[in-house]
């Protein structure tokens, strides 16, 4: 359970990093404009974008590929967990559970797992009280 939560947190972190864009403030643009003696604000934005382009492409390429690998592995783990939980919870065979999971969308599988682990966490919390 702990590893599953950590893996989901890592996936979310990599997704945020891969899709993040640098914030451009007016102060940064003014500095670029003064350094290059540009009168047009659009030229300053364009120059700043060109300066950061190579670093961003390298970072996004690395995190994008890593993100895809982690996402694929997380999806496989979620499918296996959903089948295992259905077998245990509903008392059906593994083949029947696999057929049910295959019929579900990824969103439905995630919701099913979140409900299951949410109930489990609530039970543990109530036992401690």
From Swiss-Prot:
Expressed by the venom gland. Keywords: Antibiotic, Antimicrobial, Cytolysis, Hemolysis, Secreted, Signal, Toxin. It is found in: Secreted. GO terms for cellular component: extracellular region. Pfam families: Latarcin. Cleavage of the propeptide depends on the processing quadruplet motif (XXXR, with at least one of X being E). Residues 21-60 form a propeptide. The keyword DNA repair does not apply. The keyword Transmembrane does not apply. InterPro entries: Latarcin_precursor. GO terms for molecular function: toxin activity. GO terms for biological process: cytolysis by host of symbiont cells; defense response to Gram-negative bacterium; defense response to Gram-positive bacterium. Belongs to the cationic peptide 06 (cytoinsectotoxin) family. Insecticidal, cytolytic and antimicrobial peptide. Has insecticidal activity against the flesh fly S.carnaria, and against the cockroach N.cinerea. Has insecticidal activity against D.melanogaster. Has hemolytic activity against human erythrocytes (EC(50)=6 uM). Has cytolytic activity against insect Sf9 cells (EC(50)=1 uM) and human leukocytes (EC(50)=3 uM). Both the N-terminus (61-94) and the C-terminus (99-129) of the mature peptide form alpha-helices which probably disrupt target cell membranes. The linker region (95-98) probably derives from a processing quadruplet motif (PQM), found in propeptides of many zodatoxins, hinting at a fusion of two originally separate membrane-active peptides. This is M-zodatoxin-Lt8a. It comes from Lachesana tarabaevi. The gene is cit 1-1.
